[in-house]
């Protein structure tokens, strides 16, 4: 029976050791572990771990690899001149640990751990750092809208921030949106056929749970033909007393407003005083004061409003009464002579007496 000699055993062991050494020397460096994606707040701390194998003879780098790569470390030496960064190496686990304190918004991005084998051959692993940022509504969002009644309106709202902000639409005073709800979620709010009732202030609200969010006010103007309402279509007043005739006009753009009687346009003079008062939401109150009413001034008056989208008119009838109406005749006295005062006084006394005896 053949038995190996001692010299043969030594030779075999030596060959095995050489084979193992060559095999190990030929092993390609690998990255066995890299920290998973990190999400941090501004001012916080993050640590990236990169574990390597078979890389003792190679250079290991940390880089920030966004548009322009920034070298942070080489081997166990920190390269970046920023006191917020630090680097440690754990030889037991062959792990490089890159730490960033007091995280800033600009620290967000992709970090790469890289083993340099040659100028053309590298082994890399990446980890992404996301930094929570409050929403900021972008300048390319809608600022304001002017549209004709019946046309389509589209409002857009975009915001930066992390996590991605949610965009919610509201109206002033929580009025119902054209979508038939108090709120609408989405970057674009569409009104297929805008009505004058849709005008007003809309709020674009961006929120992602970081800070208090951001808001933009968008003013929507709707162009439409005038609409006139008359609070008191018939008014009575006694002779020689003032009387105010009123009409309310709703229109955009602001209309031209005139008062007429018997197809003759009235103007400010000793008989009439015309005033216009613009209120919010495209309303205008127009008042025609008839000064010391005369017989010929009783009858129909027309309030007419016109803009480039159309026109409207409404009538107000002024009729004669015996007793003065207050307002606007409160405290007003007309003295044309003693005879007039006496006649008026006797007339009023007679009316009051008749009313008393009738009981």
Curated annotation (Swiss-Prot):
InterPro entries: Ig-like_dom, Ig-like_dom_sf, Ig-like_fold, Ig_I-set, Ig_sub, Ig_sub2, Ig_V-set, Neural/epithelial_adhesion. A lipid is attached at residue 336 (GPI-anchor amidated alanine). One of its GO terms (biological process) is cell adhesion involved in heart morphogenesis. Disulfide bonds join 50-113, 157-204, 247-303. The keyword Glycoprotein applies. Keywords: Cell adhesion, Cell membrane, Developmental protein, Disulfide bond, Glycoprotein, GPI-anchor, Immunoglobulin domain, Lipoprotein, Membrane, Repeat, Signal. This is Lachesin. The lineage of its organism: Eukaryota, Metazoa, Ecdysozoa, Arthropoda, Hexapoda.
